[in-house]
């Protein structure tokens, strides 16, 4: 980000309260390079309800229950230009969007729907959330430390969706359309329907996102080789892309009797992507790539009145792609056609039991078994003759079949100790087996909730977790990006990372939230860049660090000015430490303190007609990732929201990243490593229209994990 933009950005932030509602779309970038076909692959990188305290003239937006905070999310977003579940979650205190994903208090967070954990990857789950209308949300439960009975470890957000109530027939629906311009045009159409008849209810959802993309990347590198030579490389990369994504969901519930239910949910996704890239400068390259992704996910759940829950889930994912590459770099020449595919079959079965006992005791236990088979290949061909090419230093043909099995057995209890103190504790034992790893681990979880006075809540949590690597990251393969100078290397020896965290949260007057935490991650894994000392290539590869540590403080403070301004400010300060003693030939031990500021303001311009202006913003100071340095970044967004037809129709005009300061240009200046990537940044303007029809007679409904797919 150019420094001349920092001052006006900060002035705007301080003069008009802001927030971090960053718009997520196909142009979001993260510091990884997992796919050879993205627009810019280098940047992929108990049970006791506590009393509420009413603030004069306001309803509480949050109430505390043992181990979790329950937010009135529809109220939080009622005046915001939010039209889908993903953007709605970004309005929760402490939730930010970083690198195209959601974080809670600076840490990764798992999102589930209706209390059901899915086998969808993170990317597939986010796509599903973006297709779910915000009007379908009933509430959000935030857990900084999820008990084992949720079959999730670490931070968790549970989104409960509205359903029709039992009784007479009812139906309702929503139509949505959006047009945006971010250098090139983009479109979205969405339709949803909710139906109920006696004991049966169903929901249907379809969305279509499509458009064109444009990106520019300027690279500057000083590449040092072991022979003492230094090579100056400067390139200009221009990419043009187009894509279509179709998402569909069908969910059904049959209520056999009270608390006796059979449910089935199907989620599907089909997408196509086409990219053309031209590179000039020290390297001259032309790259064309295409991909098609199919995902099918089905889940069956059965719940009984005596606390028994059972279920099964199947996920099928298939992602074939191809790439045609012609590249010249000094005396090196690359000419080949690559065809690759990842096909995943994953099954999950679970059985869980909960008991409500006397004297405030609760008992829960269960087992979860997950198995997957990854069939992947990557082959190289001569682009002229179509003949297969044999493996060499530059070409690595690969075909693999990898099976993974996980068995998790857990038990836990809850106890109310009077009116002010409650406790929830559990222990999970897990066996993880692959062709490389065969290990047992245990994961303790403890939550304490103390209410010294009405409206004042103190929560303390101790948790442990494991983060599994992506399937494609552990393949023994080499892929090319950036015209050939950049290579992506798989790492078959990549191991899961293990995380341990202690966190304290204090809620004042049921709306002011303060948190402090410490987190230690052993074998932390992230994709990093390394300029090879043996040849003129830069290598992107997932590696296990010795550890990563974080300590942080967070404050979330909402405030209002009469009836015309509703605001919230969230501040975070984080100490960040990463260490790796065997990082190639340049071990590192790096520390950094950085801050994050989010602010959100809604100005009521008029009540008749209903017209509101939303101004949001985000600032993130300098940070690190491995040997990367990440510059200061931030954005300012504005949206004008007009509600008509008694709230059934909403028109939203918006402009995101007004100052074009949201995209960072990461750089490396560490020992022999010297490289900078300047990425293009464009403001986005758009308009959306939402129309609701039918009538809601509300009841209560969850999503899948695809984070590790290619």
What are these regions (language model features)?
Residues 177-183, 197, 208-212, 268-272, ...:
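Transmembrane beta-strands of outer-membrane beta-barrel pores
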Residues 591-710:
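Conserved C-terminal beta-signal and adjacent last beta-strands/turns
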